[in-house]
Regions:
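Short glycine/proline- and aromatic-enriched beta-strand/turn motifs that initiate or cap beta-hairpins
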Residues: 18-66
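Residues that define the transmembrane beta-barrel architecture of outer-membrane proteins
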Residues: 42-46, 77-83, 123-131, 162-170, ...
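Sec-dependent N-terminal signal peptides
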Residues: 4-13
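Outer-membrane beta-barrel transmembrane domain signature
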Residues: 153-224, 252-254
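Short loop/turn motifs that connect adjacent beta-strands in outer-membrane beta-barrel proteins
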Residues: 18-20, 56-60, 90-101, 138-147, ...
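Surface-exposed loop and membrane-interface regions of Gram-negative outer-membrane beta-barrel proteins
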Residues: 62-123, 205
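Residues on the lipid-exposed face of transmembrane beta-strands in outer-membrane beta-barrel proteins
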Residues: 48-52, 83-91, 131-137, 150-152, ...
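Transmembrane beta-strands of outer-membrane beta-barrel pores
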Residues: 27-31, 54, 65-69, 104-112, ...
Length: 255
């Protein structure tokens, strides 16, 4: 567990050192579904995010770190870390297919939970490898982006509890500056849909996290600073049915 945590922190350090990086800090108010309220309320999440285009394609990565401040969580610790790293390969920028790339991706994480004895136990979170096609339309500065992905998804699960007959994932990513012609307002987010076998039956999973940010720093010569909100909407993600988790946050852009 310590080795895995060390590798995760190395990833954090690498992402933070890159251009095109931002860091977000969210307070999670918990699920609007009262049956799930105690599972997600009163938690703080740090997200470190990177997007870096180059002449061979682009690299995207993020790391989520959840901090324990809820009475049911392990005390004084980062109790969950989750990361995604995706690389798009494109060697045909001058061809008619310039907006289409080959994408390879890794998803996974580590968590801490309480055992029946009251102690802490570590566990892995859906380690998965993905490969497929990425279609991306964007402005020259990538401030406005429209991105569709169709990926084959392999979930590493020795017990075959999560395997699906059609192991595909569909992803839609968007970003829009000056949303609704409002200067400094940015609307962005993603939508993931994939198939996954649940504990009892086949099911499909949906996760979307739309964000709305306002560049408050533009009013006092600090354009890196943003405040905003994120709403996590999921279906069959961490439990059965629909969950809606509103958050408030601040963001700092390093570029």
């Amino acid at each position: 567990m310590k080795k895995h945590l060390f590798l995760l922190l190395l990833c954090v350090a690498w992402i933070s050192a890159q251009a095109g990086t931002n860091i977000q800090l969210f307070y999670d108010f918990g699920s609007l579904n009262t049956a799930c309220q105690n599972e997600r309320s009163n938690r703080i999440t740090t997200t470190i995010e990177l997007f870096y285009p180059d002449k061979w394609g682009s690299t995207f990565a993020f790391i989520d770190l959840d901090y324990a401040i809820h009475p049911n969580d392990p005390k004084n610790t980062i109790f969950l870390g989750y990361t995604e790293i995706a690389r798009c390969l494109n060697f045909w920028h001058e061809s008619p297919a310039k907006d289409l790339s080959i994408q390879v991706e890794y998803n996974g994480g580590l968590g801490l939970g309480r055992a029946n004895t009251g102690g802490l136990i570590g566990y892995g979170i859906s380690h998965a490898g993905l490969i497929g096609l990425n279609y991306c339309l964007h402005t020259k500065d990538y401030k406005n982006i429209f991105n569709l992905e169709l990926l084959y998804k392999y979930i590493a699960d020795g017990d075959n509890k999560l395997k699906n007959k059609v192991p595909l994932q569909f992803t839609f990513v968007w970003g829009c500056d000056d949303f609704c012609t409002a200067p400094g307002l940015r609307f962005c987010g993603f939508l993931d849909i994939w198939g996954q076998r649940g504990p009892d039956k086949q099911s499909w999973v949906m996760l979307t996290e739309p964000q709305l940010w306002y560049n408050v720093g533009r009013w006092f010569k600090c354009p890196n600073l943003h405040v905003g909100t994120e709403i996590e909407v999921s279906y069959n993600f961490t439990g059965s049915g629909v969950m809606v988790n509103p958050c408030l946050g601040i963001k700092w852009n390093f570029d």
